């Protein structure tokens, strides 16, 4: 199974990069996990939020693996449990899907990008910092994969 996470933004605190790397390492042979940062568009000086999101959309679309099952993180998305996320991964794996999760920038994502997604998901009803979202998503993906492989990491 191939899982890609694209996140708009760079220059995260070291603890964020270390936590994402730690969970990414844990996937081992159970899943191929890739994380890629997308350069954010600078705001101000004639670039408003709409223009910025449009520029970021272009970069995101270029980075999505061809034919990938696209999942965008959005506050209006469904919030699955860890077990439900595992069931989604199981289905995608059985269908031979390469799954790509997208974490938008500070202003979110364009409606067009959201419409292209085959699923909208949220991690929480709370507003979370982007660095925390990277860590939480990677941990939950690792947890879901561990559930599918009956690894003792997840306990009910």
UniProtKB/Swiss-Prot annotation:
Catalysed transformations (reactions): pseudouridine(1915) in 23S rRNA + S-adenosyl-L-methionine = N(3)-methylpseudouridine(1915) in 23S rRNA + S-adenosyl-L-homocysteine + H(+)
Family: Belongs to the RNA methyltransferase RlmH family.
Oligomeric form and interacting partners: Homodimer.
EC number, as in UniProt: 2.1.1.177
Entry GO MF terms: rRNA (pseudouridine-N3-)-methyltransferase activity
Keyword list, A-Z: Cytoplasm, Methyltransferase, rRNA processing, S-adenosyl-L-methionine, Transferase
Protein name in UniProt: Ribosomal RNA large subunit methyltransferase H
Class of the enzyme per the UniProt entry, highest EC level: transferase
Subcellular location: Cytoplasm
CDD domains, per database record: RlmH-like
Gene name as annotated: rlmH
Binding, S-adenosyl-L-methionine: 73, 104, 123-128
Domain of life: Bacteria
Organism this protein belongs to: Neisseria gonorrhoeae (strain ATCC 700825 / FA 1090)
